[in-house]
Amino acid sequence: MIEEQDGWTKIEAYNDRDELEQGWVKSSRIRTVTPNQTYGIIVDKMTQRLYLYKEGRLLTTLLCSTGTTSGGNSAINETASGEFLLCSWTGGFWSGNLYCDQAIRFNGGDLMHMVPAIYSGGQDENGNPVGTANYDICESALGRRASHGCVRVQRKDNADGYSHTWLWNNLRGQKDIKIIIWDDDGRKLRETDPATPMYYNKDGGKKYHTTARCASVKSRYLPLSAITYGDLSSYPYNQLSPCTTCGAPERPEVVAAWNSVIDEAYDELGLTP
């Protein structure tokens, strides 16, 4: 809220296109809500991670995908930044040929839901999915922008035993859980210590991992061989790409290039990042 005048209040908020807007509403329509004091959620559009907090402490981290900013519909697909409340457990819905299960609404058309699936038999006359669910396309995009505006959350349990299904089942009885969507504009990527252990499949693997027993790798190749993050700058490890299942950090040159762009932009403005 910015100011009040004659029964009207001027407010400022992001719209569904992630544009900051101001406008006047009747003061009588504004109510104060105390957010849930047990659980809270942060979705970071830069890291493409969902952070679940309990009583002020980080409980777990999940991979997610927010709205894509590429293509002709980038403004429409952008996930709005700001602070919201989880307001309704709406359940599964169709978005084209994608079935998005366990959806929880937090802002107009924006929902938080399980990573979508494509069903082999499509849907029946009642809108129910038919056949076998294939998550490969959307699951492989976790950790990157990929959605139409919603927040897609990982389906498989992480190392802590959490997934979107855990959120769906355990947060449902809670009221007014705050979800904060952090923007990525003007922010630098975190630099990883070169000595940080990474792992790869020496038998033709194409990705590097944060754990020697990543769930995305077939058991016959486990445990994976150890390298360091610094090794990724030299051959043959410079051919590897980050695994999104275990949340491997971006490659060193990607981080350096992004941060250089941010530094140059701030230099032009005479500011410090």
Predicted region positions:
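Exported/periplasmic cell-wall-interacting domains
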Residues: 20, 77-81, 93-198, 203, ...
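A structural motif detector for short, solvent-exposed N-terminal "entry" segments of globular domains
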Residues: 25-72
